[in-house]
Amino acid sequence: MKYFVIALALAVALVCIAESTAYEVNEELENELDDLDDAAWLAVAEELQGLEDFEESRGLFGKLIKKFGRKAISYAVKKARGKH
């Protein structure tokens, strides 16, 4: 009977230790997950901020490309017709 009580006490002690460390691990994992969520949000925010600059530059270069593209097409048409 004495060994049964000792074994039961050891089992209870091991269960208590396992439970207490499980919460610490879960809290660490939740904190890491929160950090990853924050990092992902910051990466998206930086990407969107860079996208605004890209949109501005694309607008400027897009106009220039259209302008030169029209001139190139009209030049090619004139050359094909033999007028140039």
Curated annotation (Swiss-Prot):
A GO cellular-component term linked to this record: extracellular region
Keyword annotations from UniProtKB, A to Z: Antibiotic, Antimicrobial, Cytolysis, Fungicide, Hemolysis, Secreted, Signal, Toxin
Subcellular location: Secreted
Propeptide section residues: 23-58
Stretch forming the signal peptide: 1-22
GO terms for MF: toxin activity
Database matches in InterPro entries: Latarcin_precursor (IPR018802)
Expression (tissue specificity): Expressed by the venom gland.
Modification(s) after translation: Cleavage of the propeptide depends on the processing quadruplet motif (XXXR, with at least one of X being E).
Motif Processing quadruplet motif, residue range(s) on this chain: 55-58
GO biological process, one term: defense response to fungus
Purpose: It has antimicrobial activity against Gram-positive bacteria (A.globiformis VKM Ac-1112 (MIC=0.7 uM), and B.subtilis VKM B-501 (MIC=0.4 uM)), Gram-negative bacteria (E.coli DH5-alpha (MIC=1.0 uM), E.coli MH1 (MIC=0.7 uM), and P.aeruginosa PAO1 (MIC=6.7 uM)), and yeasts (P.pastoris GS115 (MIC=6.7 uM), and S.cerevisiae Y190 (MIC=54 uM)). Also has a strong hemolytic activity against rabbit erythrocytes. Causes paralysis, but is not lethal when injected into insect (M.domestica) larvae.
Family classification: Belongs to the cationic peptide 03 (latarcin) family. 02 subfamily.
Domain notes: The mature peptide (59-84) forms alpha-helices which probably disrupt target cell membranes.
Protein name: M-zodatoxin-Lt2a
The organism of origin for this protein: Lachesana tarabaevi
Upper classification of the organism: Eukaryota, Metazoa, Ecdysozoa, Arthropoda, Chelicerata
